[in-house]
From Swiss-Prot:
Annotated SUPFAM superfamilies: P-loop containing nucleoside triphosphate hydrolases
GO CC entries: cytoplasm
UniProt-recorded Gene Ontology molecular function terms: GTP binding; GTPase activity
Protein name per its UniProtKB record: Ribosome biogenesis GTPase A
Keyword Nucleotide-binding among UniProt keywords: yes
Stretches assigned to the CP-type G domain: 12-157
Protein family according to the UniProt entry: Belongs to the TRAFAC class YlqF/YawG GTPase family. MTG1 subfamily.
Gene: rbgA
Binding locations of GTP: N54, K55, V56, D57, N109, T110, G111, K112, S113, T114, G153
UniProtKB keywords: Cytoplasm, GTP-binding, Nucleotide-binding
Localisation per UniProt entry: Cytoplasm
Entry-linked PANTHER family: MITOCHONDRIAL RIBOSOME-ASSOCIATED GTPASE 1
GO process annotations (BP): translation
Protein's job: Required for a late step of 50S ribosomal subunit assembly. Has GTPase activity. Binds to the 23S rRNA.
Length: 262
């Protein structure tokens, strides 16, 4: 994958330096793909770490419960949340120690900026649908004196598999317009179809989707490119309903090693 804004690489280097200033890390992950959206390449193992599964309202409920148990069995602290959850509920779940100095991280479009703004109690930073929109690194404080460090989203410089790229596409962490490899679209559709029980082939599904949405070229030919753009944008936004794109039992030891912090 060639898409990798320079500010994300810069932030990754800075985060390694800033880890010495904090004692707690909150990893914001998309509940629809908790493994794929943990792809940092930064080792947080020496810090108290909270895995925050965001967007649980658009993830499959049973699968989310499996992920919570999966992380708990690994001895990790995990909480769940969503955009509509009140600030006081989120703060209670996080239950930071008064002396906490917190680093909040997340790959693009996991909802990290929304979490940050909710904790601030006001919409103080730019929140948008484009991955990597928050470019600065800054501190802010909660009412009880807890200090929180905001960071941009982080992605691997090298997305090492079609499977990972496909899942990041499905949750919106990779911009759909930057995908140049048809195989990634095909793999993403395969994952989506398996998740909700679609039996149509890739070509059948998108030809039908294009016709239903009026995405046609001259002569009534389905515009597959526009169909792909619209479909994957809507899936990332949660318009396909409550669906998860990976399960704990599908993650192999090799995959876990590939995404281990460095």
């Amino acid at each position: 994958m060639s898409w990798y804004p320079g500010h994300i690489e810069k932030a990754k280097r800075q985060i390694k330096d800033l880890l010495r200033l904090v004692n707690t890390v909150v990893e914001v992950r998309d509940a629809r793909a908790p493994f794929a959206t943990s792809a940092y390449g930064v080792d947080f193992s020496r810090k108290e770490t909270i895995i925050l599964l965001n967007k649980v309202d658009i993830a499959d409920e049973k699968t989310t419960k499996k992920w919570v148990e999966f992380f708990k069995k690994q001895g990790k602290r995990v909480i769940t949340t969503h955009k509509g959850e009140p600030r006081k509920v989120l703060l209670k779940k996080l239950s930071f120690d008064r002396l906490a100095r917190v680093l909040i991280v997340g790959v693009p479009n996991t909802g990290k900026s929304t979490i940050i703004n909710k904790l601030k109690g006001k919409r103080a930073s730019s929140v948008g649908a484009q991955p990597g929109i928050t470019k600065g690194i800054q501190w802010f404080s909660l009412e009880n004196g807890v200090k929180i460090l905001d960071t941009p989203g982080i992605l691997y410089k090298n997305i090492f598999s079609e499977d990972l790229a496909a899942k990041l596409l499905l949750v919106g962490s990779l911009p759909v317009e930057r995908i140049e490899d048809q195989r990634i679209f095909e793999r993403a559709f395969e994952i989506f179809a398996r998740s909700i029980g679609i039996e149509s082939s890739f070509s059948e599904f998108f030809e039908d989707f294009a016709r239903k949405r009026g995405l046609l070229k001259k002569g009534g030919v389905p515009d597959i490119e526009r169909a792909l753009m619209l479909f994957f944008t809507e899936v990332a936004q949660g318009k396909a309903g409550r669906v998860s794109f990976e399960r704990p039992e599908d993650i192999t030891p090799v995959q876990q090693e590939q995404t281990r912090g460095v």
